[in-house]
Amino acid sequence: MAVYVVDHPLVKHKLGRLRQHDVPVSEFRAIANELCRLLAYEATKDLETEKVSVQGWAGPVEVDQIKGKKITAVPILRAGLGMLDGFLDMIPGAKVSVVGMFRNEETLEPVQYYTKLAKNIDERMAVILDPMLATGGTLDATIDLLKNAGCPQIKGLFLVAAPEGLKRIVDKHPDVDIYVAAVDERLNEHGYILPGLGDAGDKIFGTK
């Protein structure tokens, strides 16, 4: 497994805006999707391409196209939906799989309540979308679910991650690559990321 922190001035600037307590819901949504586009760009650098011939304005021309890689986006409900449009802007042909989980606030462990995976998941690269990687419990459970379904390759895109959650995933899933805009300082006693973004789901959906 590799952890890729996308070190770019645009990423830093946009993430800094998300950290501001009074950012409007509409702006939070827009920036979350902008950051997801930048993360998706980095996460797909290793896709193979092949030459194909197309009809250009002056006749046939050889162009590059992605070679036979089927992709499914996997937003984790509900906050992951706030990154989905950005991902599909970059990869409009991707299928969408949905995993519904919430974190038990007492045990901090995930509780699964809904799953709908794309057909032929065993032939697809899955890209998990979630703004926050905190304890790693939800991501761990989602990776297990995808692996049990036969998914051959898994990556994850996150806006911020805590070192504790990253360690959990690195230790258990060394074959999964993680792309993140920032690795924050730590978790607090309630399992929230510091400095973090606050409740990303509430900020995306305007429920608080």
From Swiss-Prot:
**Which residues of this UniProt protein bind 5-phospho-alpha-D-ribose 1-diphosphate?**
R78, R103, D130, P131, M132, L133, A134, T135, G136, G137, T138, D199
Q: Which GO terms describe its biological process?
A: UMP salvage; uracil salvage
Q: How is activity regulated here?
A: Allosterically activated by GTP.
What note does UniProt attach to the cofactor annotation? Answer: Binds 1 Mg(2+) ion per subunit. The magnesium is bound as Mg-PRPP.
Keywords, in A-Z order: Allosteric enzyme, Glycosyltransferase, GTP-binding, Magnesium, Nucleotide-binding, Transferase
Q: Quickly give the catalysed reaction.
A: UMP + diphosphate = 5-phospho-alpha-D-ribose 1-diphosphate + uracil
InterPro entries reported for this sequence: PRibTrfase_dom, PRTase-like, Upp_B, UPRTase/APRTase, Ura_phspho_trans
Record bears the keyword Acetylation: no
Q: Does the keyword Glycosyltransferase apply?
A: yes
Q: In which pathway does it act?
A: Pyrimidine metabolism; UMP biosynthesis via salvage pathway; UMP from uracil: step 1/1
Q: Which residues bind uracil?
A: I193, G198, D199, A200
Question: Which molecular-function annotation in GO is an example for this chain?
Answer: uracil phosphoribosyltransferase activity
Q: What is its EC number?
A: 2.4.2.9
Transmembrane parts of this sequence: none
Cofactor(s), names only, from the UniProt record = Mg(2+)
Q: Which cysteines are joined by disulfide bonds?
A: none
Looking up PANTHER family in the UniProt record yields: ADENINE PHOSPHORIBOSYLTRANSFERASE (PTHR32315), URACIL PHOSPHORIBOSYLTRANSFERASE, CHLOROPLASTIC (PTHR32315:SF4)
The family assignment reads: Belongs to the UPRTase family.
**Protein purpose:** Catalyzes the conversion of uracil and 5-phospho-alpha-D-ribose 1-diphosphate (PRPP) to UMP and diphosphate.
Q: What is this protein called?
A: Uracil phosphoribosyltransferase
